[in-house]
Curated annotation (Swiss-Prot):
It is found in: Plastid, Chloroplast. Its cofactor is Mg(2+). It comes from Heliamphora nutans. Its main location: plastid. This is Ribulose bisphosphate carboxylase large chain. The gene is rbcL. It comes from the Eukaryota. The disulfide bond which can form in the large chain dimeric partners within the hexadecamer appears to be associated with oxidative stress and protein turnover. It holds the Pfam family RuBisCO_large_N. The lineage of its organism: Eukaryota, Viridiplantae, Streptophyta, Embryophyta, Tracheophyta. GO terms for molecular function: magnesium ion binding; monooxygenase activity; ribulose-bisphosphate carboxylase activity.
Length: 441
């Protein structure tokens, strides 16, 4: 018959160390921890097989297609320095395996099934190389960094934000008042917390109205463009779109979405709506630590960040390096560059396993948020540079005199740090002197 049934080792078909990767391949770097007795080549090949064309046995229908054309290939394996029984397995996927413009489909293929695999003790997706041929099928961020600056008329400094606290329990009117005080004091943006959607104590429509009122009042009094990230995340895509439409009708500049809990399909729909209707889109990464916190299992945040740039968002939370949530400096700056820059060189010391060419896909502003305050300002200005959003929740509202003085303090500290930097002073060394001097006037 010509068909030979039976179970074969994956590595016979899917481990191909002599394979030359193509410019159109999607490349993945997996951190593989095989079960005892499973050779790393077999583990790497198993990942390649199960995330592409393979199954546990040879099947009759394999003969009806060209496996060589469609199969994923594990083309290189290296041990992880300093770790026992951990390997980086590099896998190449032919572009034809993926639907155009669908982050959902890309993830379903690459990480959909392999993580429960018996032969592996643990598996982590460390990085993806997205070829231009694939990234060009995505719209990407609704507007990007330059267009956002032009819309807001704010240049040469990071933007300032603040998450309104207490995150749950305020009425819409009181919430709007808190927004107004922060914006009036000098912040560029205020923010709905990620879990503020439409609860019994504050329905979304009421919140949108009072926040819009606060924005327009603060704009009129300061002469600056202001915004509040109105969280459009909802239980259905239709409801989410309804909220975004209402925000557009109010004439506000920006809405917000929780892209991991909301899902990539919803996020991409919202990003398309935002581009078509001139809304900026702020992205919160609620649930990311469930996926990315374990060092040897899950998906590294740099992959989730790349996926967001493809799906679409103008801001995304990216850790602080200095605040209350964890993040190592070089690694964080690695994916901050992946969000902002057009071309990023491979650099293993920053966790970047592949050179990434975004071919003019718009950039995303990284948002530093979580446990930061005025005294972190010199470090944040130096680490993140101008193209970022610095978000102080408790660091604004926790000011002993209240919201507006807290906002003033943040704006003064930021302007002082930017000026000092532009004058050539060393923020890391002199930061603690710059801020008290600025606060005197």
């Amino acid at each position: 018959v010509g068909f030979k049934a039976g179970v074969k080792d994956y590595k016979l078909t899917y481990y191909t160390p002599d394979y030359q990767t193509k410019a159109t391949d999607i490349l993945a770097a997996f951190r593989v921890t095989p079960q005892p007795g499973v050779p790393p080549e077999e583990a790497g090949a198993a990942v390649a097989a199960e995330s592409s064309t393979g199954t546990w046995t040879t099947v009759w229908t394999d003969g009806l297609t060209s496996l060589d054309r469609y199969k994923g290939r594990c083309y290189h394996i290296e041990p992880v320095a300093g770790e026992e029984n951990q390997y980086i397995a590099y896998v190449a996927y032919p572009l034809d395996l993926f639907e155009e413009g669908s982050v959902t489909n890309m993830f379903t293929s690459i990480v959909g099934n392999v993580f429960g695999f018996k032969a592996l003790r643990a598996l982590r997706l460390e990085d993806l190389r997205i070829p231009p041929a694939y990234s060009k099928t995505f719209q990407g961020p609704p507007h990007g960094i330059q267009v956002e600056r032009d819309k807001l008329n704010k240049y040469g400094r990071p933007l300032l934000g603040c998450t309104i606290k207490p995150k749950l329990g305020l009425s819409a009117k009181n919430y709007g008042r808190a927004v107004y005080e922060c914006l009036r004091g000098g912040l560029d943006f205020t923010k709905d917390d990620e879990n503020v959607n439409s609860q019994p104590f504050m329905r979304w429509r009421d919140r949108f109205l009072f926040c819009a009122e606060a924005i327009y009042k603060a704009q009129a009094e300061t002469g600056e463009i202001k915004g509040h990230y109105l969280n459009a995340t909802a239980g259905t895509c239709e409801e989410m779109t309804k909220r975004a439409v209402f925000a557009r009708e109010l004439g506000v500049p920006i809405v917000m979405h929780d892209y991991l809990t909301g899902g990539f399909t919803a996020n991409t729909s919202l990003a398309h709506y935002c581009r078509d209707n001139g809304l900026l889109l702020h992205i919160h990464r609620a649930m990311h630590a469930v996926i990315d916190r374990q060092k040897n299992h899950g998906i590294h945040f740099r992959v989730l960040a790349k996926a967001l740039r493809m799906s679409g968002g103008d801001h995304i939370h990216s850790g602080t390096v200095v605040g209350k949530l964890e993040g190592e400096r070089d690694i964080t700056l690695g994916f901050v560059d992946l969000l902002r820059e057009e071309y990023i060189e491979k650099d293993r010391s920053r966790g970047i396993y592949f050179s990434q060419d975004w071919v003019s896909l718009p950039g995303v502003l990284p948002v530093a948020s979580g446990g930061i305050h005025v005294w972190h300002m010199p470090a944040l200005t130096e680490i993140f540079g101008d193209d970022s959003v610095l978000q102080f929740g408790g660091g604004t509202l926790g000011h002993p005199w209240g919201n507006r003085p807290g906002a003033v303090a943040n704006r003064v500290a930021l302007e002082a740090c930017v000026q000092a930097r532009n004058e050539g002073r060393d923020l890391a060394r002199e930061g603690n002197e710059i801020i008290p001097v600025a606060s005197k006037w």
